[in-house]
From Swiss-Prot:
One of its GO terms (biological process) is regulation of cell shape. This is Probable serine/threonine-protein kinase KCC4. Involved in regulation of bud growth during cell cycle and in septin organization. Plays a role in cell wall synthesis. SMART domains: S_TKc. Present with 538 molecules/cell in log phase SD medium. The gene is KCC4. Residues 388-404, 481-494 have a biased composition (Low complexity). Its EC number is 2.7.11.1. Residues 372-387, 408-427, 469-480 have a biased composition (Basic residues). The modification Phosphoserine is found at residues 396, 675, 707, 777, 822, 825, 871. It is an enzyme of class 2 (transferase). Residues 21-285 form the Protein kinase domain.
Length: 1037
């Protein structure tokens, strides 16, 4: 193509528009350039623009003096792509070029590549896979019938439109196949290339395309490739392809028909390979074939169309050659003599002239068929205001395009610049050898086409009927209209001949050149204008289809959005119900017939009085004193407002009762030990709440509230509740001075008691409550003063702790174990004597304050407890202020350490303690001098490995009850974890470690270590584990 000088514009910034197309976002990159989304400025139609750099042409051996001239093979390739008009072949709409790039305006496939569909969804169902495969075979059959082979078929080059129809794209490797010549270029992808291409042998392109289709079918049905190497070794892959070595899927993966078709396609010998038309008649494709598919197959051109382009529908050879198509071939071959082309068309065998003739002839038939179908039921009316322009010129003007130079070029270019570039309409040409019997080729959009009357080649003079070439060549209104579609805008070239159009190409003042965009070449542009005309009707049809697609897409999105909203609403409701159920299950109190909120205490009292339910002793009451429960707040019913005065009074009494129960719960046995002469207290039986009458208090003898006495508190487990219950009671210690003077207080209470040194071991061992209370009080003082005066503390004076119990089912009653026991006494300075509160109001059978949580004493006998008699040291500093004692719980020691501690105490005491062996199934506790790590031990009679596995499963099942961060060290048999403070047991957060150690003779030992946190929490955990082991019968008796 001849290009005018545009150096002043070549360095400019690349334009965002090419002709009428406005370039947009980049869709992807290829080997020859990038692909951008484009939109028509007037119609809004979207296309894909493939940008090809001209530097590729120069690198491929194009050494023309004019760089803007495209190679002939590129021009032919573009014409072939345009002439391939099939629903399953990607359409080429237009071609534009600049100084540096070539722009191919292609059909836009919205759903992308078939490869991405397989990656996202995996193998397709057989019906969908066969529908896609059938469209691929039909499109390739169309190309093969016209002598075109693709040679690069793969899922990446198969695109999908908005309706998931196949569009075969990327004809960059395509070639014209003839019988005389075999192809030799090795091209394509290794996974899809045929064995003959991989081997480097001359091959027939039709058979190689069939092999690629077989690989694609395998991928559609299985989601993988038949020839592949996991390590990426291309050499091994090519060897597999050469041998045709692959694994056929079994019947469970694909059907027998699919196995048969794949076996017939993937044959190494191309001569034995199934033909493309035979695939369409295979039972697998016939299984899912529809009427529409049958029609598409029927509309395919003859299989040997490229061999006999001059044959008619009955394969009878026709000697006549269409002159208009012949002239187009002359234009395409850049002035090649027509006789030479005619001889090529009539000779035997195949050649490129026959293939191009067949393509143009097929294109012409499709255009005529489409035009006749649109105008079948229309009545043509004569329009007086419409004109018909015909151009007459001699064939000499066609053959010598630059022979007419009668007027200055400047004037001619200006006139045609206004007529062409300003309207941005492209010209249409149809070359005809006979002005009377030649007919225009109507394009698919039925745009108006002006045909040129070409006279005899021997006539050199201009006919008298031809006007001045620089004036408009229009006839009168009475001239007969030759366009097929009425009411279409005129878009024809108003020059006298092709010679004048060629001269305009060389003009520098063209507006196309000013906008840095031009057509490819003069002769090539002539052909492109004829077959690429973007007709108005075609664009309107596309706009209508696009609008319908958008409306359907909007409806589909609306339905999907509504469905998603409904699903989200349903999931939210379901999640809310599950969360509510979890909350209800987590609440330990029964929820039967609770009509109102559980937050307010008045509602609880009214419900208890109304229903009179026998509550289980294993449940915890719900009240405002319990911080772990926060139910939903609701308003009180109207009938309860009348009882406000009575309920307020009752509320105070209930609260005082609860406080007194916590204040006095652990002092019952202490009081019994201090008064050995009094009668035994009968055990309190489990009974429902039967009354809320005011309790009788002795104001002179008992403090009414805990806040009345400023004392430190030490929380421990009450003996009046079952071990399954988590209630705690508070033992009041009257200042740290009372710790020293407790023995003197006991002596004053009963002066006949013997001194501490004479206390018999049996009496001391039967009632551990007093010793435990004193020990706990002593521990509080020691823990607080440990950091300050640790050097002054004598560890020998600290009493040894006693076991807290053997299990949750073993309980202490409130009887005096021995009425004649001797209390501990100690000489000290006299201090103020404070009377402990009496329990007269709770000794009755129907007492309402504590009866709810009591149960009958367990029949399991308690093990005898070992105690050591030692004096309480007085060397603790008195500088600590009153009320600052903390609840730090001492660490524990093993049995051997306890004996060593007792031996050390023997040096300072008169009477050596008598040690009684503890039961092996009890939890052992000891206290270090300054340590803060608690150790508990449980003995079992099974091997340590079996015991560790049982603990592993047990603790895993307790994760939902507050056990977190469990770490299992199988090698060392160590389990570490944490009990969080928001657990269902409402215990303090504690970090613990459990070790399973061998104990000889197939026995084992569980050792609990408290790292940080609460001793009470660790003891609770050890006790619960001990109960489970006792039920399983694995405790060491």
């Amino acid at each position: 193509m001849t290009v005018a000088n545009t150096e002043t514009h070549s360095a400019a910034k690349p334009s965002s528009t090419i002709g009428p197309w406005k370039l947009g976002e980049t869709l992807g990159f290829g080997s020859t350039g990038k692909v951008q989304l484009a939109q028509h400025e007037r119609t809004g139609h979207r296309t894909a623009v493939k940008v090809i750099s001209k530097s590729i042409f120069n690198n491929n051996g194009n050494h023309s003096n004019d760089d803007s001239v495209l190679p002939y093979n590129i021009e032919r390739e573009i014409v072939i792509m345009k002439l391939l008009s099939h629903p399953n072949v990607l359409s080429l709409y237009d071609v534009w070029e600049t100084n540096n790039n070539l722009y191919l305006i292609l059909e836009y496939a919205e759903k992308g590549e078939l490869f991405n569909l397989l990656v996202d969804h995996g193998p397709l169902p057989e019906r969908e896979a066969i529908n896609c495969f059938r469209q691929i075979i039909i499109g390739i059959s169309y190309c093969h019938a016209l002598g075109i082979v693709h040679r690069d078929l793969k899922p990446e080059n198969l695109l999908l439109d908005s309706f998931y129809n196949i569009k075969i794209a990327d004809f960059g490797m395509a070639a014209l196949q003839t019988d005389a010549d075999l192809l030799e270029t090795s091209c394509g992808s290794p996974h899809y290339a045929a064995p003959e291409i991989v081997s480097g042998l001359p091959y027939e392109g039709f058979a190689s395309d069939v092999w690629s289709c077989g690989v694609i079918l395998f991928a559609l049905l299985t989601g993988r490739l038949p020839f592949d190497e996991e390590n990426g070794n291309v050499r091994d892959l090519l060897l597999k392809v050469q041998k045709g070595q692959f694994e056929m899927p079994n019947d469970t993966e694909i059907s027998r028909d699919a196995q048969d078709l794949i076996g017939k396609i993937l044959v190494v010998d191309p001569r034995q390979r199934i033909k493309i038309r035979d695939i369409l008649s295979h039972p697998l494709l016939k299984k899912y074939q529809t009427i529409k598919d049958s029609k598409s197959i029927k509309d395919l051109p003859r299989e040997n169309t490229y061999l006999y382009p001059l044959a008619d529908s009955n394969n009878h050879t026709s000697a006549s050659i269409d002159d208009s198509i012949l002239q187009n071939l002359v234009v395409l071959w850049h002035g090649r003599h027509a006789d030479d082309i005619v001889s090529k068309l009539k000779e035997n065998g195949t050649n490129k002239e026959k293939i191009l003739y067949a393509l143009l002839y097929r294109f012409k038939l499709d255009s005529v068929r489409g035009s006749n179908k649109k105008n079948r039921n229309k009545i043509k009316k004569t329009k007086k205001n419409k004109r018909s322009s015909t151009l007459s010129s001699s064939s000499s003007l066609l053959l010598n395009n630059r022979s007419i130079q009668s007027t200055p070029r400047r004037r001619t270019s200006k006139r045609h610049s206004r007529e062409f570039s300003s309207s941005r309409k492209r010209s249409s040409f149809l070359l005809s050898s006979n002005p009377t019997d030649s007919s225009p080729i109507p394009l698919r959009s039925s745009k108006r086409i002006t045909h040129i009357n070409v006279a005899s080649a021997n006539t050199q003079a201009t006919p008298s009927g031809v006007p001045n070439p620089h004036k408009r060549n229009s006839k009168k209104r009475s001239s007969k209209r030759l366009s097929y579609m009425p009411n279409t805008k005129r878009s024809s070239l108003t020059s006298k001949s092709l010679s004048n159009f060629t001269n305009l190409i060389d003009d520098d003042d063209w507006e196309y050149i000013e906008k840095d965009a031009k057509r490819t070449s003069s002769n090539f542009a002539t052909l492109i204008d004829e077959i690429f005309e973007p007709e108005k009707f075609e664009l309107a049809k596309r706009e209508k289809a696009e609008l319908q697609r958008k409306v359907q897409e909007a409806k589909r999105q609306s339905v999907n959005a509504q469905k998603i909203n409904e699903d989200e609403f349903g999931s939210e409701v379901s999640d809310g119900m599950k969360e509510l159920k979890k909350i209800n299950d987590k609440v330990s109190s029964p929820l039967i017939n609770y009509e109102f909120s559980q937050q307010e205490l008045l509602q609880d009292i009214d419900t208890l009085l109304t229903n009179r339910y026998q509550l289980s002793s294993y449940t915890r009451p719900i009240s405002r004193l319990d911080p772990g429960l926060t139910p939903v707040t609701e308003t009180l019913p109207n009938n309860l407002k009348e009882k406000t005065a009575l309920l307020q009074d009752t509320e105070k009494k209930i609260i005082e009762t609860i406080r007194r129960s916590k204040f006095l719960g652990s002092l019952l046995n202490v009081r019994g030990g201090l008064s050995p002469g009094k009668s035994e207290l009968a055990p309190i039986e489990e009974s429902p709440i039967v009354s809320t009458t005011p309790l009788i208090y002795n104001d002179r003898m008992e403090p009414r509230r805990i806040s009345d006495v400023e004392v430190p508190h030490f929380t421990r487990k009450s003996k009046h509740f079952t071990t399954a219950n988590n209630r705690r009671s508070v033992l009041s210690l009257y200042a740290k001075d009372s710790i020293k003077d407790l023995n003197e207080f006991l002596i004053k209470e009963d002066p006949d008691l013997p001194p501490q040194g004479s206390t018999d071991n049996e009496s001391r061992s039967e009632d551990p409550e007093i010793a435990e209370s004193i020990t706990d009080s002593r521990n509080i003082q020691y823990d607080e003063d440990d950091s300050k005066d640790g050097d002054n503390v004598n560890n020998d004076n600290i009493l040894s702790d006693f076991p807290q119990g053997v299990g949750i089912s073993q309980e202490y009653d409130m009887k005096d174990k021995n009425p004649n026991q001797s209390p501990i006494s100690k000489s000290a300075e006299p201090t103020l004597v404070v009377k402990l509160p009496s329990l007269s109001s709770f000794q009755g059978k129907n007492a309402s304050g504590l009866g709810l949580y009591q149960r009958e004493p367990s029949k399991v006998t308690l093990p005898s407890l070992t105690s050591n008699n030692s004096s309480v040291g007085e060397n603790i500093e008195d500088g600590a202020e009153k009320g600052t004692e903390s609840e730090k719980i001492a660490a524990s020691l093993s049995d051997d350490d306890l004996k060593e501690d007792n031996d050390k105490k023997d040096n300072d005491t008169v009477n050596a303690p008598t040690t009684v062996k503890k039961p092996p199934n009890s939890v052992l506790l000891k206290k270090f001098s300054k340590g803060k790590i608690l150790e508990l031990e449980i003995h079992a009679k099974i091997p340590e490995k079996r015991l560790y596995e049982g603990l592993h499963k047990l603790l895993e099942g307790w994760k939902q009850y507050g056990l977190k961060n469990l770490v299992f060290n199988i090698t060392n048999m160590i389990i570490t974890g944490k009990l969080v403070n928001d657990s269902i047991l409402f215990l303090r957060s504690t970090l613990f470690e459990i070790m399973v150690l061998p104990n000889g003779d197939g026995r084992s030992l569980i050792k609990f270590n408290k790292k940080t946190g609460s001793t009470k929490t660790l003891t609770k955990l050890a006790t619960e584990i001990q109960i489970i082991l006792q039920k399983e019968g694995v405790l060491d008796k």
